[in-house]
Structures are given as C-alpha cells and as structure tokens.
C-alpha cells in the first residue's frame, strides 16, 4: 500500500460501499454535528439534492431521531461519541436495519481519531476536517442514486 493511499485514507475514505434500499421513497439523512455552521451547510447542500435532512447537535437527540425518524444515512461528528469509545455507533451497528444504513464519520483535525479505530467502530466512510463538504454530499448522493435490490 502506497503512502499516498494511506495519506488520503486519513483524510477521506469509503470502506464499505452501500446503496439505499428500493421501495423506500423517503430519503432521510441525519447530520449529527456539534458545529452548527457545518451541520447547516451540509443540510442545505443535501436538501438541494432532494433529500430530507435533520441536523442535531447532541447525542441524546440523535439517539431519539435514529429510533423515531429512521434515517437511511447518518453523518456523525465523532466528537459526540468518541469519549465513550463509540458506544452509540457500536450499539447502532447491532440494529438489524443497519446493513442498509450509511454511517459516515466526520472527525476533527485534532485530536485525530485513528482511521483503524473508526473502521473498527463500524463506520462505512470517514471525512476528516477540513473536508470539503461536496465530498460528503457526493458520497450521500451516490448512496441514494443506485438503489440496492434484494
């Protein structure tokens, strides 16, 4: 593996390619990010793509929204869950519906979440700040553009 690939993976990576399930007309994305401006910016861009989006800034609300609103994609600011060792995400991974849900880690530049730790926690993709929001928007749009059929 070249050092260039490793450098890129530490900034942006997609480890598991997923597609939204066919038959679910709603396309819901939950943005869980402490920084209001980042969350709002992503929300605007994703809504322009025709997606339903909610932005939440705390893990308690995120937990409730995951259960009640059942988003197909979750963009999670890792600082909301890293102190617990990603207990929220690991618990979410045990949910039977998770194979069809896109889980994206949005981490800060410092302290840096180790890429392997994010993979082990169960994230499908990773974007480290300062990550261009268009990369996340493209990733989410691709998830919804080619539905998964069973």
Region spans (language model):
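Alpha4 helix (beta4-alpha4-beta5 surface) of REC/receiver domains from two-component response regulators
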Residues: 87, 107-127, 138
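Two-component/phosphorelay signaling modules centered on CheY-like receiver
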Residues: 35-54
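Conserved active-site segment of CheY-like receiver
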Residues: 34, 78, 106-110, 130
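Alpha-helical interaction/dimerization surfaces of two-component signaling modules
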Residues: 44-46, 65, 117, 139
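Conserved phosphotransfer cores of two-component systems
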Residues: 67-69, 93-100, 121
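Non-catalytic signal-transmission and effector/linker regions of two-component phosphorelay proteins
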Residues: 1-36, 43, 132-150
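Conserved phosphotransfer microenvironments
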Residues: 76-92
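Acidic, metal-coordinating helix/loop segments flanking the phosphotransfer/catalytic sites
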Residues: 55-73
């Amino acid at each position: 593996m070249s050092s260039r690939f490793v450098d890129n993976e530490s900034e942006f990576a997609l480890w598991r390619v997923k597609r939204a399930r066919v038959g679910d007309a709603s396309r819901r994305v939950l943005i869980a990010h402490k920084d209001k401006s980042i969350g709002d910016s992503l929300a605007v861009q994703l809504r322009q793509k025709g997606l339903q989006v909610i932005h939440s800034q705390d893990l308690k609300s995120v937990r409730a929204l995951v259960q009640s609103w059942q988003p197909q994609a979750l963009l999670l600011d890792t600082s909301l869950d890293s102190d617990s060792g990603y207990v929220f995400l690991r618990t979410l991974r045990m949910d039977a519906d998770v194979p069809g849900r896109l889980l994206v880690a949005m981490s800060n530049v410092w302290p840096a979440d180790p890429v392997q730790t994010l993979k082990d926690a169960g994230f499908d993709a990773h974007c480290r700040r300062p990550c261009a929001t268009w990369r996340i928007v493209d990733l989410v749009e691709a998830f919804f553009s080619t539905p998964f059929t069973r």
